[in-house]
Regions:
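Short, charge/polar-rich alpha-helical segments
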Residues: 317-353, 381-392, 427-433
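Membrane-engaging insertion elements
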Residues: 223-314, 437-445, 461
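Terminal export/targeting leaders at protein ends
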Residues: 1-205, 355, 360-362, 392, ...
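Long, amphipathic, heptad-repeat alpha-helical coiled-coil stalk/linker regions
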Residues: 246, 356-482
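Solvent-exposed flexible segments
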Residues: 171-175, 179-182, 199-223, 275, ...
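Membrane-penetrating hydrophobic segments
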Residues: 183-211, 215, 234, 238-254
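Extended, compositionally biased accessory segments flanking or bridging domains
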Residues: 307, 318-319, 326, 476, ...
Length: 534
């Protein structure tokens, strides 16, 4: 029952009522309260009337004028579930909203039991009322208790005016209910004077409780209107006369008994903790402010359609992001697999290129050693070969001359000459090695000349080298193509990774703005397994 009432109250809360509650819960923090109280104190010192906290709420309400009701309703509902740390669920059916609302009432009820020790004994005496009714009655009763002393300070004329408006409400009730109120108040007649005396002697809290018991919660609307009308006398200042629904809340927030525990709850510097403490402290008040309009006046046609449509819009957008992320992830895996396979092919080509290059080196060695052991003058390769052969033979002759000179010096047995010859032979040895390098160079040049020729000399080796070179060209071309392909894949993968990062940020933003989405699976549209919280 309580869950249904709260759910109905949320989807029927509209206009300024909705925006004031929204501003109070989502647009108010400990800084606003402290700043407002400070400004009020300064104003009092200068003997100026002000209510800066109410002004803050009014400003926030004005900012929300163009926001659709269902958007604010869903935001408000999700914020309550976030503060209570309820597990998120789908809200595609009315019953799902009602079930979650039932959990909200139960949790807020427990919060109020912890926050106010008086509530336990009050609830025990209200055993025939639901948890939701107990919370509302208790909070309104506390407010009226605060006003009892103020009422005694009214002039008789003001007391009579106040009682007259209360009596006007009673006179509008059926006669049977009027009779019950007379019995419970112990009066013979329901006149303005009798009501005034009853309030003056028993207190507004007792009188109002009797009226609510008989007539229902509709009287609270009249009571809050009365508070607005007599706000100046009660010490409550409202700069806007049209809206009166938050009168009780403003009075509670202005009470030091509410503010001081919040400030002390987390230490002077723990602002975030203070804000959470403030919002938790506000939860019973918020639930009361949400439900009072519906419980007092009811609604002819309660429809969840707009609320559900707004939730579905958000959930569909969330599912779309999740699906996009899954698709990007799958694309990323596909690209990684293609990159890995392409790298393997490139490695295979590098190995094949190395093998072909090794074959060419081996075949060139065969030609090299064949030239070294052949009579070069008998080989008619080509013109370049003949030029290089002449240089090669010239260097070879010079090496032989140097070696012969070393032998002549070696047979001289004079002591000093032998010492001189050792230095001379050392220089000759260096000269020989230098000439051998030159000769080797020309020998390799002749190998290249053979490869360029059409001679029958080492034709098989030459053909093998040509075949290997052809294979090399094909392999290198294929490798370049694979490298280009790999680079394009890596570029695509980089873009996919960036897309995934961007989508994850969008998902996180949606989860932050819409508590409970992180508990849902977009692909299966089922609840995800509960993870252990640290």
């Amino acid at each position: 029952m309580d869950g249904q009432i709260l759910a109905n109250s949320i989807v029927t809360l509209k206009g300024t009522d909705l925006r004031m509650v929204y501003a109070l819960l989502l647009k108010t923090n400990i800084g606003h309260l402290l700043s407002s109280k400070t400004k009020d104190v300064i104003s009092k010192l200068s003997k100026e009337e002000s209510d800066n906290f109410t002004y803050h709420l009014e400003q926030e309400v004005n900012k929300l004028r163009n926001v659709e009701d269902q958007v604010l309703q869903v935001d408000l509902f999700l914020e309550i579930t976030r503060l209570l740390k309820l597990r998120g669920t789908k809200y595609t059916l009315e019953q799902e909203i009602v079930d979650q609302s039932t959990f909200i009432v139960k949790d807020v009820y427990q919060l109020l039991l912890k926050q106010d020790k008086q509530f336990k004994s009050f609830a025990e005496n209200e055993w025939n009322s639901t948890k939701l009714q107990q919370m509302i009655k208790f909070q309104m009763s506390k407010l009226f208790n605060e006003l009892d002393n103020s009422f005694k300070d009214f002039t008789i004329d003001d007391q009579t005016k106040f009682a007259s408006q209360v009596n006007e409400y009673i006179q509008g009730l059926p006669e049977e209910k009027q009779r019950k109120i007379k019995e419970k108040l112990g009066v013979d007649d329901l006149t303005d004077e009798m009501i005034r005396k009853a309030i003056a002697t028993s207190g507004s809290s007792i009188v109002f409780a009797i009226i609510v018991e008989v007539s229902g919660f509709a009287f609270y609307t009249t009571a809050t209107s009365l508070l607005a009308s007599f706000a100046g006398l009660f010490g409550i200042t409202l700069p806007f006369g049209v809206y009166t629904g938050l009168t009780s809340t403003i009075a509670v927030l202005a009470n030091p008994l509410f503010l001081v525990p919040v400030l002390l709850g987390g230490g002077a510097l723990l602002v975030n903790h203070q804000n959470k403490s403030l919002k938790k402290k506000l939860m019973p008040i918020i639930v009361m402010q949400i439900t009072l309009p519906f419980m007092s006046q009811g609604a002819d046609d309660v429809s969840f359609d707009l609320f559900i449509a707004e939730w579905n819009r958000r959930f569909d957008a969330y599912c779309k992001l999740q699906i996009e992320l899954e698709n990007e992830h799958a694309e990323g895996l596909k690209l990684q697999r293609n990159i890995r396979e392409t790298k393997e092919k490139i490695n295979y080509m590098n190995s094949a290129i190395h093998n072909e290059e090794q074959k060419i080196r081996e075949e060139k060695k065969q030609i090299y050693y064949a030239l070294k052991s052949s009579n070069l003058e008998d080989l008619g390769i080509n013109g370049d070969f003949q030029k290089n052969r002449i240089e090669y033979q010239y260097i070879n002759d010079r090496i032989q001359s140097l070696q012969q000179a070393k032998k002549v010096d070696a047979v001289n047995d004079s002591f000093f000459r032998r010492i001189g010859n050792k230095f001379s032979n050392l220089g000759t040895t260096f000269d020989i090695k230098s000439e051998e390098k030159k000769m080797n160079k020309y020998l390799y040049l002749m190998v290249e000349d053979v490869l360029k020729s059409t001679s029958s000399f080492k034709q098989i080796e030459r053909e093998r080298i040509q075949a290997s070179k052809c294979n090399l060209r094909e392999l290198r071309q294929s490798k370049n193509e694979k490298m280009t392909y790999k680079n394009s894949l890596e570029s695509l993968l980089k873009q996919v990774n960036q897309n995934q990062s961007s989508i994850r940020q969008d998902i996180k933003a949606m989860e932050k703005q819409n508590y409970g989405l992180e508990h849902l699976s977009a692909s299966s549209q089922q609840l995800l397994p509960t993870s252990e919280e640290g």
